[in-house]
Amino acid sequence: MKDKTIWQEVLNRGKWVIILLVAFVLSQFPIGLALFLANKQFPILQSGLLVGALSIVVLIVFIIGARKTQLATFNLSFFKAKDLARLVLSYLVIFATNLLGSLLLRLTNEVTTSNQSILNGLVQNSSLISTFFLLVLIAPICEEILCRGIIPKKIFRGKEKLGFIVGAIVFALLHMPTNLPSVIIYGGMSTVLTWTAYKTERLEMSILLHMILNGIAFCLLALLVLISRNLGLSF
């Protein structure tokens, strides 16, 4: 009987590993489409609408899946003033680690991280509509559900603390750190996001924080893109 229970537990965790991998692949469809359309020099407006439409489909699947499996309710009725203070403080900590990482990049004669360089190239050659969906919606919702939802709560169920650590490492690795500065930037970001989800026991809180981070980054990138396209400058 005990062996049967252990076998069932292994099968259940294995099922969630497969779900994690399938969900990750699904989350990459919008950016894959954006890269494909940019490579084919598809009209910017139409490509933005296509990527936006696909992103909405992916988001619906993720949100429904998270609600059905009780990873998140996406009901913000719990949100209070102290939660706003937590988000502000968390953002400032991430900003500080990003600043430290950026200073170290300068000292090593590098301008930006490998991940940011790829992102800049995508933004320059894609619609701002695509960038908005990918940065502000797809990345925060999908990455948080994967790294701070499925990994700690399902795959490591019963050992959530270990699961949060693994999820934090996976998140950092997904952003392709190639040197110490990029490890500080993405490792710091991942640590704060993980702490937020763990401490509040609300995946919605880390999603909100992630959205704020990427939303501010999107606004800055959009401004640079508009300057670049109107004045013929590059960044």
Task: Identify what each model region corresponds to.
Residues R13-T69:
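Alpha-helical transmembrane segments in multi-pass membrane proteins
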Residues L59-F79, E204-M205:
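Cytoplasmic juxtamembrane interface segments
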Residues D3, A96, N125-F235:
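Transmembrane helix-loop-helix hairpins at the membrane interface
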Residues L26-A38, V61-F62, V93, T97-T108, ...:
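Alpha-helical membrane-inserting segments
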Residues I31-N39, I63-L71, G101-R106, C142-E143, ...:
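Membrane-water interface at transmembrane helix exits
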Residues N39-L45, L71-A139, L226-F235:
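Juxtamembrane helix-loop-helix connectors linking adjacent transmembrane helices
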Residues M1-V10:
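Short, Lys/Arg-rich, polar N-terminal cytosolic tail immediately upstream
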Residues R13, V17-F29, G52-I56, L87-F95, ...:
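Alpha-helical transmembrane spans of integral membrane proteins, capturing the lipid-embedded, hydrophobic core
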